[in-house]
Amino acid sequence: VPLAGVLNGLGYVMIARIDPELAGLQMMWTVLGVGLFTGVLAVLRNSRNLSTYRWTIGLFGLVLIALPFTPLGTTVGGARIWVSFGPVTFQPGEFAKVALAVFFAAYLVEKRELLAMGSWGVGRLRIPDPKHLGPVLVAWGVSLLVMMYQTDLGSSLLFFALFVVMLWIATARASYLAVGGTLFAAGAVFAWSTFDHVQRRVRVWLDPWEDVTGEGYQIAQSTFAIADGGMVGTGLGQSGQVAIPVAETDFIFAVIAQELGLFGATAVLVAFLLLVGTGLRTAVRADNPFDTLLATGLSALVGVQAFIIVAGVTRVLPLTGITLPFVSYGGSSLLGSWLLVALLVRISDGNNRRAAQRDGQPVVAGRADA
C-alpha cells in the first residue's frame, strides 16, 4: 500500500505540473480509488469466496471487454476502448483484466492437474485434453480478438502475458512458456500483416525520424526529453522546450526521466519492482492454490503493464498506448490499480490471520504484507 501511494502521489505531482486543470480530476480519482480500496476490504472478507463465482466473474470480464463495441463505445486516439454514459467516460478493460485474473486463477486450480499431466500427445510432448483447456483458451482468444479489433494491442499483450504466466505457475510446465512464445510470435506476424495500425506503429518504432513531424513526433519528442534529463534531471517544472503530446498518459515516464533524470526514473522502476515483489511474496506465502495463483496473476499484471509502457517510451518495444499503473492520468486506470492492490492486501491479510490462528497467536486486525 505505501508503494502504491508513493507512485500515485508522484503521478499526481507530475500531472499537476503538466496540466494543472487535470490535477483536480486526478485528485478526485485518487480519492475514489482509495475509497474503492477500502470498500473492497470491507466487503470481501475472504478472497477465496471469489472462486465460487468464477464463471460469473469471467463472463463479466468478457462483457466489459465487449462493451466498447456497443453503441456506448467511443473512439479516442484511434482506439475504441472507451464507454460513455452521459458525461462519464471510462475504460472497461482496466476492470476486465482483474476479473479475468480471478477467473483464470479459479479455473486453473480446478483443472491444473489435468493440464499439467496432459492426456494425449506426440512422443514426449503431452497436450491437455481440449475440453479441459477449452474454457481458458476461449476466454483468452476472445479477449485478444476483441482487443485487436479495438486497435488496443497493449491490452492484448497484457492479457496474453497474464494467461501464459498463470498457466505456467499452475502447471509448473515450462513447455507452456515455449508454446506461449510461439503463439505470441505467430500472433505478432499475423497482426503486422493484417492491421494497418500495427504496421504504422512498427514503422514508427523502427524509425521515428522518417516522419518526425507526423506519426513519429511523439516518440521523437520522448527520446529528446529523456536525453535532456541526463542523470539528475532538469528539475520539476523545468522541462525546457521539449513538449510531448499527451504526456500525462502514454508518455508520463518520459516526463519523469526528463525532470528527475536517470536517478528518478530508476527510483520509479525500483518502486514497481518492489510492488511486484511484494505481490509475489504474498503468492509464495499463501496457504491455498487459489490465493497463490490470483496473487501471482495480479502481480504479473502490474509488472507486465509497467514494462510494456516503459519499454514503449524508451523504444525497446513498439508503443502500445497503455497507461503506467498509479502514475498516468486516468480514472479507469487508477480505480483498476487500487482494486488490484485491494485484492492483494486481502489475500495477504487472510493468510496472515489463518497462520496466526494455527499458531494460537492473537489476530491483529488489518495486518497485511502487501
Set out the residue ranges of the language-model regions.
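Long, low-complexity hydrophobic alpha-helices enriched in A/L/V/I and glycine
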Residues: 51-55, 95, 225, 231-232, ...
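Glycine/serine-rich anion-binding loops at beta->alpha junctions
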Residues: 86-96, 150-151, 230, 234, ...
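Transmembrane helix boundary and interhelical junction motifs in multipass membrane proteins
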Residues: 152-157, 232-236, 247-249, 262, ...
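Hydrophobic alpha-helical transmembrane segments of multi-pass inner membrane proteins, especially
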Residues: 1-218, 254-312, 339-343, 358-370
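TM-adjacent membrane-interface loops and short helices in multi-pass inner/ER membrane proteins
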Residues: 208-252, 262-264
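Transmembrane alpha-helices of multi-pass inner-membrane enzymes
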Residues: 317-355
